[in-house]
């Protein structure tokens, strides 16, 4: 093997396809450029050789980033984190994750974008472009169908091919347009085969189908059989020489050298894997690394993204806050919560308490904080708040749910019991209660939603959380975030959560009906629909036009009018419905969106091009994407349940053009 001027004997090729230590590629004693990996995706999570975690900017979690529906901000987040990768010697950031939020119980939902494959894919694509524009590699993960943390090392996602293609592989296919340097294969099995040993997924689809030409890296410890993984398409097993105890009964099978000698490992496969690792080192060596932002600017970037990612879910006219005095309850108002695991970031920015930010807002708003449910809190804190509230203009409760993080799933989607109890007690005494929810995924608010005046979904919004929230509450920022996932009325309404199946087998019985595709198709009531979010401004939609462009494309245009006195941003969403489908299809599917700034009392014409694949489904008999002739409905709305405009079109294609190139 020869890569440029690098000649490698068989022994060095074998060393190359497993990592060096916990985080590095084997540089073969200096023969190759060293490559260092570090975790993300909400900021650099890097542990040095002494076990110390580097300090970094805590960016909003991907759920908050997705709630912005802003592609420019997705790119900005990637650029911002790349700066700190450069400053700390990280060459490849292990992010982003584009796994679908199949169930609200997944403990890592806060690390993923959406329940929708299109939104997940395009946000992931822009994030990758941001990271790599600075000369740092991105790692697209966790490929694929890794949608629970429950027994993640051994669970098998049992999913039919059409569902796999349309829902779980589609976000990867879209994000791969950004050409990430690496893709990470996941821990789980798909239909009984470990992803790390699945040639159909890693080679036939990822490389031959999607055209990925970079390096396939295993998740840390996901390789059970080194030679089988190399044969399937894994290039680099991380970390160094990890083999599970259960497999050690026949260790020589896992020894790549022995497998090569026995003919179990083909020389061509080893050549491919080692070559892809060498090419990764060459990318690192050739990278033009550029730091864009100062430390202060990175913080401002975090705040800017958080402002657009906060979602106003309910408002009975109490927001924005008027001048007055407000009691603030909850530890999140002082120190916001965040998820754990690989996405943990050790921040060095000291967040300001919400009441201090109120005081400095210039809006004559005063706040006083009460801990309520922190470690040192007691019923005494509640009594103090209740007494103080008699002379206050309102109560702001900052609540959060049960622990979220890597390697475990949520036990509930409700907020913690004592917090719910205090909401119930305080709303019995006072009318003006506002609830701010700091959570990483869907929350069941049904027991108390009708008792409060306003609800703000803050999410895990990073080190700028309270600055962003204050700006929204006092009206300096007009909220523009919308939900990137459906909030069901209760956990029982979430079809995909009904049991873990039989042992380690997870049946995807719902098929393609994930998230709003399920709720909208089967007319299920929801607490808040996909794409929903309120604003202080008001928008009207009008004048939908759909014009054919080329043989299979369509231009969709419509007008958005801001009828309020406030300049604001609106997220409009374009859905497609196959009216008389020959196969089972959802009620509607998101195919495009636009986030537009519209000045008060002005209009904006939005134009979106829909390519042919927007109308396609995956045909099992044809083994291809197929566009069905017939009637389709173009829908434009403010959410999946708030469709403002509709227009029917008829597609009539000759047989030779009916197969999409997707």
Language model features with spans:
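Glycoside hydrolase catalytic-domain context in secreted enzymes
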Residues: 1-617, 626-641, 653-662
């Amino acid at each position: 093997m020869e890569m440029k001027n690098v000649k490698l004997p068989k022994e060095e090729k074998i060393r190359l396809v497993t990592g060096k230590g916990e985080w590095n590629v084997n540089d073969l004693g200096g023969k190759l450029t060293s490559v260092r990996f570090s975790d993300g995706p909400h900021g650099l999570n890097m542990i040095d050789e002494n076990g110390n975690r580097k300090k970094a900017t805590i960016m909003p979690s991907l759920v908050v980033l997705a709630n912005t529906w802003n592609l420019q901000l997705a790119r900005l987040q990637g650029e911002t984190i790349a700066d700190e990768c450069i400053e700390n010697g990280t060459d490849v950031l292990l992010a982003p994750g584009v796994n679908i939020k199949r169930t609200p119980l997944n403990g890592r939902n806060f690390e993923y974008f959406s329940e929708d494959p299109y939104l997940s894919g395009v946000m992931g694509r822009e994030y990758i472009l941001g990271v790599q524009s600075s000369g740092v590699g991105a790692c697209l993960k966790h490929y694929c169908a890794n949608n629970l943390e429950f027994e993640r090392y051994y669970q098998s996602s049992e999913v039919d091919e059409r569902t796999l293609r349309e829902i779980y592989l589609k976000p990867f296919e879209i994000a791969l347009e950004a050409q990430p340097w690496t893709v990470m294969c996941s821990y789980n099995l798909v239909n009984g085969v470990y992803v790390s040993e699945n040639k159909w997924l890693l080679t036939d689809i990822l490389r031959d189908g999607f055209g990925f030409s970079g390096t396939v890296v295993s998740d840390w410890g996901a390789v059970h059989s080194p030679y089988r993984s190399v044969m399937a398409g894994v290039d680099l097993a991380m970390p160094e020489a990890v083999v599970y105890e259960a497999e050690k009964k026949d260790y020589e099978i896992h020894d790549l050298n022995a497998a090569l000698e026995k003919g179990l490992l083909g020389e061509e496969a080893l050549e491919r894997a080692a070559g892809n690792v060498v090419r990764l080192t060459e990318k690192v060596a050739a990278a033009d690394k550029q730091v864009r932002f100062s430390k202060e600017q990175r913080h401002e970037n975090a705040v800017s993204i958080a402002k657009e990612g906060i979602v106003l879910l309910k408002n009975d006219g109490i927001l924005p806050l008027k001048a007055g005095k407000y009691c603030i309850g909850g530890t999140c108002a002082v120190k916001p919560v965040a998820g754990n695991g690989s996405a943990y970031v050790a921040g060095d920015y000291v967040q300001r308490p919400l009441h201090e930010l109120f005081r400095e807002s210039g809006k004559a708003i005063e706040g006083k904080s009460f801990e309520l449910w922190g470690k040192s809190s007691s019923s005494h804190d509640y009594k103090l708040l209740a007494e103080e509230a008699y002379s206050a203009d309102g109560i702001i409760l900052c609540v959060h749910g049960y622990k979220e993080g890597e390697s475990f799933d949520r036990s509930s989607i409700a907020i913690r019991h004592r917090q719910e109890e205090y909401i119930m007690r305080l709303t019995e005494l006072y009318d003006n209660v506002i609830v701010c929810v700091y959570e990483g995924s869907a929350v069941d608010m049904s027991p108390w939603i009708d008792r409060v005046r306003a609800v703000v979904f803050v999410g895990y919004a990073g080190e700028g959380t309270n600055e962003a929230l204050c700006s929204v509450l006092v009206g300096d920022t007009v909220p523009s975030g919308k939900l990137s996932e459906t909030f069901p009325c209760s956990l029982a309404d979430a079809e995909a959560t009904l049991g873990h199946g039989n042992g380690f087998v997870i049946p995807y019985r719902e098929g393609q009906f994930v998230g709003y595709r399920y709720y909208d198709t089967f007319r299920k009531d929801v607490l808040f629909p996909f794409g929903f979010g309120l604003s202080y401004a008001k928008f009207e939609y009008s004048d939908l036009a759909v014009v054919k462009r080329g043989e299979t494309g369509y231009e969709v245009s419509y007008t958005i009018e801001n009828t309020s006195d406030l300049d604001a941003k609106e997220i409009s969403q374009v859905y497609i419905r196959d009216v008389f489908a020959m196969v089972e299809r959802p009620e509607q599917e998101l195919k495009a969106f636009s986030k537009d700034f519209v000045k008060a009392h002005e209009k904006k014409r939005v134009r979106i091009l829909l390519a042919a694949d927007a109308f396609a489904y995956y045909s099992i008999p044809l083994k291809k994407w197929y566009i069905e002739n017939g009637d389709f409905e173009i829908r434009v709305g403010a959410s999946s349940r708030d469709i403002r405009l509709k227009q029917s079109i008829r597609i009539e294609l000759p047989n030779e053009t009916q197969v999409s190139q997707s």
